[in-house]
Amino acid sequence: MGLVVVGAGGRMGQTLIRTIQSIEGAKLVGAIERSGSPFLGKDAGEVTGIGTLGVAITDDPLPVFAKAHGVLDFTSPAASVEFAGLAAQARIVHVTGTTGCSAEDDEKIRAAARHATIVKSGNMSLGVNLLSVLVQKAAEALGPEDFDIEILEMHHRHKVDAPSGTALLLGEAAARGRDIALADNSVRVRDGYTGPRETGAIGFATLRGGSVIGDHSVILAGTGERVVLSHHAEDRSIFARGAIKAALWAHGKKPGLYSMLDVLGLNT
């Protein structure tokens, strides 16, 4: 499967390029960067330190998409909306792990999925997506009258959105387990005199610092006991492997918007 990596010069872009080389059935056929990037014109393999691959980095995505089977996208919300539209024009797979999308961004990506096969997830790792299933089951079994749910996440100092896409993914799983809407039942900030905790609310706490790739814990706190479900990312390659797995799964599927739960057969 011929894959294009967008944001090829970034941390995740370089990880994707390296990881593609180790996965059977996947081949790098294109690499995209923003206009003005210092990586333009350079070989994608040389940029990532793995030697020449014969794929030059360009800022003109559509001709590259037209010759590919899929695109791997961990960029920004605005860029991901654009790439989803271009993937729809080219009728190819679009796998995006971009976080921080607004409701309007999500609607545009959903519209592009009428013509592109799109896999979108706040986290592409296999472990986190299994964790989301466990969180849903735990939230359903341990009701709001007895257990409060708090989600704690920590990432490196360079991360620009909060809570993380993974924290929100886990929050959505908890909300499904409780049969409530996360948007109406989440607490993102606590400061000053807040009063007692509201029954049934799902709280979020965000930490930023150092080089932490991603730590997430879902805490179900009851009277006299706590259940903690956690995931610790130790290498960005887990996200890259998941994204490539998603692309290979989506290749040949009908257009639509899918999640990693679909890819892993965990969607209930």
UniProtKB/Swiss-Prot annotation:
Question: Which residues hold NAD(+)?
Answer: G7, A8, G9, G10, R11, M12, E33, G97, T98, T99, S121, G122, N123, M124
* EC code(s) of this entry: 1.17.1.8
Primary location: cytoplasm
Species lineage = Bacteria, Pseudomonadati, Pseudomonadota, Alphaproteobacteria, Hyphomicrobiales
GO MF terms held by the record: 4-hydroxy-tetrahydrodipicolinate reductase; NAD binding; NADP binding; oxidoreductase activity, acting on CH or CH2 groups, NAD or NADP as acceptor
Instruction: Quote the catalytic activity from the record.
Output: (S)-2,3,4,5-tetrahydrodipicolinate + NAD(+) + H2O = (2S,4S)-4-hydroxy-2,3,4,5-tetrahydrodipicolinate + NADH + H(+); (S)-2,3,4,5-tetrahydrodipicolinate + NADP(+) + H2O = (2S,4S)-4-hydroxy-2,3,4,5-tetrahydrodipicolinate + NADPH + H(+)
Q: Which family does it belong to?
A: Belongs to the DapB family.
Pathway membership of this protein?
Amino-acid biosynthesis; L-lysine biosynthesis via DAP pathway; (S)-tetrahydrodipicolinate from L-aspartate: step 4/4
- Active-site residues from the entry: H155 (proton donor/acceptor), K159 (proton donor)
Q: Name its GO BP terms in alphabetical order.
A: diaminopimelate biosynthetic process; lysine biosynthetic process via diaminopimelate
State the function annotated in the UniProt record.
Answer: Catalyzes the conversion of 4-hydroxy-tetrahydrodipicolinate (HTPA) to tetrahydrodipicolinate.
Protein name per the record:
4-hydroxy-tetrahydrodipicolinate reductase
Cite the entry's keywords alphabetically: Amino-acid biosynthesis, Cytoplasm, Diaminopimelate biosynthesis, Lysine biosynthesis, NAD, NADP, Oxidoreductase
Write out the annotated subcellular location: Cytoplasm
